[in-house]
Every structure is written in C-alpha cells, then in structure tokens.
A protein has these predicted regions:
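Solvent-exposed, non-transmembrane alpha-helical starts
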Residues: 240, 244-246
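Histidine/acidic-residue-rich, glycine-tolerant segments that coordinate divalent metal ions
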Residues: 62-65, 82-90, 94-95, 101, ...
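Single conserved hydrophobic/aromatic residue that forms the stacking wall/gate
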Residues: 247-257
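Proline-centered helix-kink/hinge sites
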Residues: 29-32, 124, 228, 250-252
C-alpha cells in the first residue's frame, strides 16, 4: 500500500471523531487568549492518540504542541481555535483546527517512513491577538522547514493569494457638552470620526485595485444628547505586499493620516 493510501486509511478511521471535534468547537466559541475549554478539549483529543503533548507552551496558557517523529525536516501544522466576538466561529477556526489535528494524527505513524517530523502547534488569539508572533518569538517555529494550514472558503485553492495586513486604532479627543442645552461648548469627536470614514471612501476610488481598507467605529459616544468627547475606530489595511501597502500613492494609510 502506498503512503498516500495509508494516510487516507488513517484519516477515514478518525473522520467521524474529527467532525465531532469541529461541531463541539463551533458550539463552544471562545475569544483570543481565553480559549481555556477549547485548548483543553483539543489536547485531550490528541492525547487519546498520543500522550506526548506539551501544554501549555510558549508562555501562553492556551497554546500547545506535539511533535511526531524524531528525524528529518520539520513541518509545522497550525491549529487555530479562537473565535470572533458576537459571531463565534464565522472565520472557520473550528475547521482549521480540525483539519490540522486530523492531518497530524493521520501522519503520526507514517513520519518515519516519510523521513519527516510533524509538529501540531496550537496557536491562540489569531483574530488580532498575534498568537503565532508570540510563539515565533518563543522559538516554536525554530528548525521548521515549512508551516502549513488550511482555511475554509467557497472554493478549493491550493495556491491562494496572500496579503499584507496592518491594523490601526484611530482615536479622536474632543470636549463633551449637552447637545441641546449648550452645543457651542462642545467639540464633537464623532464628527471627526465620520469625516475619516468619508475620506476613506473617497480614497478608495484612487487606490491600487489590490489594496483593501475597512474599518468600524468601536466607540461613538454613549447618549444622543451628549456631544462625544472621545471616539475610536479600528481599521484593517491590506495589500499584496508591504511596499504596495505603504508606498503606493495614494495608500490606504494616507486616508487615515
């Protein structure tokens, strides 16, 4: 039997269990750096096949790792499992985690024959928390020849387009006042925030086609009859590479500045 067929046979034997893992994660979402139940659940699932799991790891309470094999180039399979506020696993981290764990478990008895090592690396807080960056700084990717994971989407794509992303928080500070009794004494921080969104909309017409810019108002005030003295928004700026993001004219960052 070929290695590929052996892998498929291993995967088929755990297919039902993997679906159960994905469904459990979907029904039990946890935010970044707070994935206590999820990380424990995943670690226990992996331990049912191999008990050599390091948990926690990388100075992160909800990170874990396990390496199959002792010799050969190291392949890291990323396991993401944090969810989004309000909308849970809308980004499909339950699928990402299940796919990587399934691949790692199915390969555990084949690594020597393949001549590789395979590491399952649980990476918390990928929705803005930078869990992989922290683990990278702690040496979790040291000696890795490559790092892989899948991401759910409407199409199967083996070589997708990747983008650079920068995240910004934009704050405006004004002066509060009663909007009906003494509006002339206020300095409306929400007006400034709205103007920023107008600027961003006009900039989109001239931006390089591959650039993307999207934001939301996180704090816009608390009562209609109070002129807001403080507002904040969060933005994601994306492009095909760093130079295109920062140095094209106009760039997404120009709209914010």
């Amino acid at each position: 039997m070929t290695i590929k067929n052996k892998f498929k046979e291993e995967l088929e034997s755990i297919h039902k269990s993997l679906i159960e893992v994905s469904d459990w994660m979907y029904e039990n979402p946890e935010l970044g750096f707070e994935e206590y139940k999820t990380s424990e659940y995943l670690v226990n699932f992996i331990k049912s096949f191999h008990d050599n799991v390091i948990f926690p790891t990388g100075d992160l309470e909800t990170a874990f790792e396990i390496t199959f094999g002792k010799e050969g180039p190291l392949v890291v399979l990323g396991v993401e499992y944090d969810a989004l506020p309000e909308i849970g696993h809308a980004c499909g981290h339950n699928v990402i985690a299940t796919a990587s764990i399934g691949a790692g478990i199915a390969l555990r008895n084949l690594v020597d024959e393949l001549g590789v090592r395979v590491k399952l690396l649980g990476t918390p807080a990928e929705e803005g928390g930078g869990g992989k960056i922290i683990l990278l700084d702690k040496g979790a990717f040291e000696d890795a020849k490559c790092s892989m994971m899948i991401h759910p989407g409407p199409l199967n794509v083996a070589n997708p387009t990747f983008t650079t992303i920068q995240q910004y928080k934009v704050e405006f500070f004004g002066k509060d006042a009663h909007a009906a009794g003494a509006p002339e004494k206020g300095r409306n921080a929400l007006d400034a925030q709205i103007q920023l969104f107008v600027n961003a909309s006009t900039y989109r017409q001239q931006m390089v086609q591959s650039n993307r810019m999207h934001g939301v108002i996180k704090d816009g005030g608390f009562k209609p009859n109070i002129i807001p003295s403080y507002t904040s928004s969060e933005w994601y700026l994306r492009s095909l590479n760093k130079d295109c993001l920062l140095y094209t004219s106009p760039s997404p960052r120009d709209a914010l500045e």
